[in-house]
């Protein structure tokens, strides 16, 4: 194995692990269960740190001597570069974590663990409990991160959170977790009169 191939494979492993850690719900959906106890870090600080790491990954890929790579590895390198470039755009330009309240709905994080029989129920329920315990802090982070929102996104998030509440009520969890969800829904309702952001991308 050439040094270039070793370098590329190391970068690829770091990118995959970092991406799964930043999106543990997506990781659960894709069948990677190392982060099943976590909720995403969608805070401004977390996303800024992630964007800086992406810049580092892209610089590291540029430093790989691709002349030494076999064709399959060269193709994989360009796929990884495209993924990082797209993710960087999403984080820094789209920045949906600052205006799309639907991203802050913890319901999918819980539902995936309950609906997929990938591990014994006891193990999955332990991760459900961990994710549920993080919900109050997660929703507080949402309120500290979300800025002006499109009305349609705000209204849809409120409707979807009703389903999340029903899901949480079916579980034996602490009442304050459901109360934190109710508090967040009330906050979203308070934001509706000011939710004038256009859902379209770009300035025109």
What are these language model-derived features?
Residues 1-204:
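N-terminal maturation segment of proteins
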């Amino acid at each position: 194995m050439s040094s270039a191939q070793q370098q590329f494979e190391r970068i690829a492993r770091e990118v995959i692990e970092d991406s799964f850690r930043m999106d543990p719900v997506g990781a659960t959906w894709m069948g990677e269960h190392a982060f099943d106890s976590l909720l995403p870090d969608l805070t401004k600080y977390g996303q800024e740190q992630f964007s800086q790491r992406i810049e580092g990954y892209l610089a590291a890929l540029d430093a790989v001597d691709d002349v030494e790579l076999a064709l399959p590895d060269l193709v994989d390198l360009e796929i990884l570069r495209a993924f990082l470039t797209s993710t960087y755009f999403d984080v820094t330009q789209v920045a949906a974590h600052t205006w799309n309240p639907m991203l802050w709905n913890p319901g999918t994080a819980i539902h995936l663990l309950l609906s997929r029989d990938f591990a014994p129920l006891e193990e999955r329920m332990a991760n459900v409990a961990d994710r549920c315990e993080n919900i109050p802090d997660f929703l507080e982070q949402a309120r500290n991160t979300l800025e002006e929102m499109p009305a349609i996104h705000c209204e849809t998030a409120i409707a979807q959170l009703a389903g999340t509440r029903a899901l949480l009520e079916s579980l034996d969890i602490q009442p304050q977790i459901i109360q934190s969800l109710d508090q967040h829904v009330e906050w979203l309702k308070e934001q509706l009169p000011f939710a004038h952001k256009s859902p379209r991308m770009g300035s025109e």
